[in-house]
Each structure stands twice: as structure tokens, then as C-alpha cells.
């Protein structure tokens, strides 16, 4: 093989290795660092998420508003409310009207059950961000069998208040509602961007 060809192959190989190394570094740079408290924080946040679902499915409004900070915000298809009293008012009105959409064959309100699938949680000190896929099901299928109603994405901001994680903002996106869908991009990228902006003192820090 001519030496010129060997040199060209060597140059191409070296360029490929540098490219792969750069891609690897970029991928590593996108991964957040986890503190030694992360497992404990994540467990507490996952527990909070579960308590939210049990509260809404069993109409326990004291428990429901209790997962939000005093100045917390809830945003979903019915609108946006800030503060526990306003959140309670909005969500109870929503629950009272849900029978129009979910009901058994004899016309009674169906039993709704929410499920969280996977969650990505970013913790930075006493602030956290999360993205979770959720789905909703109810016994409003034929002969009152279970039927999946809708699904979507939770966009969460959390803060630690007196040693307890609480929602400072929960945004509920619904893939069945065009104006409330999550969009084509990876939601985790936006979550990490919000966390990085907070760390740098940008708009997300407010």
C-alpha cells in the first residue's frame, strides 16, 4: 500500500477518534452530578408525587393542597392558581365536573386512578426540578371495565421548606389537548436548562 494512502488513513482515523472523544465529553457534560444526599432527596420527592396522586384520586383535598408550598402554583387545563386556598378551589371544581367525562354505565361518576411512569429528578441544594410521564384510567369502559382516559407530562419545580420537599409549581400537560401537549422536544433538556439557569442566577432563579 502506498505511503500516501497510509498517511490519509491515519489522518482520517485520528480525526474520527477526536470526534468520538468530543461527543463523549459532550454527553458527559450533559449529565448532572449527584450529591451524596441525592438518593434521600429523590425518595422524598417520589413520595410527595405519590401522595399527590392518592390525594386527588380519593378526593382528599387537605392532603392535596398540603403537597404544595404556601405560595405554590398549580397549572393545568382549567387554568392556573397560586396559594393553597386558590388551588383547593380550582381542583375541587374540576373534580365536581369530571363526571361529565368519566362515568359508569349507570351514569355514576367513575373512579379515576392516576399512575406515574418514569421520572427524571434534578436536585440542586434546596431546589429541585422534575419531569414525569403520567397516565389516567377509570372504570368507564364496557361493563364498567378499566379504560385509559388520557396521558401527559408533569413539569415540576420543588423547594425544601423546613426540611420538607414541596411543589413550588406543578404544570400538568395533557397530550390529548393540543394547546397543552408537551411538544416534540425532550422535556429533560428544558428541565436541565432551568436548573442551570437557576445555578447561574438567571430568570429561572426567580
Annotated model-derived regions:
Residues 1-13:
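Bacterial N-terminal signal peptides that target proteins for export
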Residues 39-40, 118, 123-127, 184-206:
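Flexible low-complexity loop/turn motifs enriched in small/helix-breaking residues
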Residues 11-22:
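Bacterial N-terminal signal peptides
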Residues 30, 127-131, 151-187:
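Short beta-strand edge/turn micro-motifs at domain boundaries
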Residues 27-67:
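Short, low-complexity N-terminal intrinsically disordered segments enriched in polar/charged residues
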Residues 61-134:
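A solvent-exposed, acidic/Ser-Thr-rich amphipathic alpha-helical stretch
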Residues 136-138:
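Beta-strand elements of well-folded, non-transmembrane domains
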Amino acid at each position: 500500500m502506498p505511503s500516501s494512502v497510509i498517511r490519509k488513513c491515519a489522518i482520517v482515523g485520528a480525526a474520527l477518534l477526536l470526534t468520538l472523544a468530543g461527543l463523549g465529553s459532550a454527553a458527559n457534560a450533559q449529565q448532572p452530578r449527584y450529591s451524596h444526599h441525592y438518593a434521600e432527596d429523590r425518595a422524598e420527592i417520589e413520595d410527595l408525587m405519590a401522595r399527590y396522586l392518592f390525594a386527588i384520586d380519593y378526593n382528599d383535598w387537605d392532603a392535596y393542597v398540603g403537597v404544595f408550598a404556601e405560595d405554590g402554583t398549580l397549572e393545568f387545563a382549567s387554568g392556573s392558581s397560586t396559594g393553597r386556598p386558590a388551588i383547593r378551589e380550582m381542583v375541587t371544581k374540576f373534580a365536581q365536573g369530571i363526571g361529565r367525562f368519566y362515568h359508569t354505565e349507570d351514569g355514576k361518576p367513575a373512579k379515576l386512578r392516576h399512575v406515574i411512569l418514569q421520572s427524571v429528578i434534578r436536585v440542586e441544594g434546596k431546589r429541585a426540578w422534575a419531569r414525569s410521564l403520567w397516565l389516567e384510567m377509570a372504570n368507564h369502559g364496557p361493563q364498567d371495565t378499566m379504560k385509559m382516559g388520557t396521558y401527559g407530562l408533569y413539569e415540576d419545580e420543588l423547594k425544601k421548606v423546613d426540611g420538607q420537599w414541596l411543589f413550588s409549581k406543578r404544570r400538568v400537560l395533557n397530550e390529548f389537548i393540543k394547546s397543552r401537549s408537551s411538544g416534540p422536544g425532550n422535556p429533560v433538556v428544558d428541565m436541565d436548562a432551568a436548573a442551570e439557569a437557576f445555578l447561574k442566577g438567571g430568570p429561572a432563579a426567580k
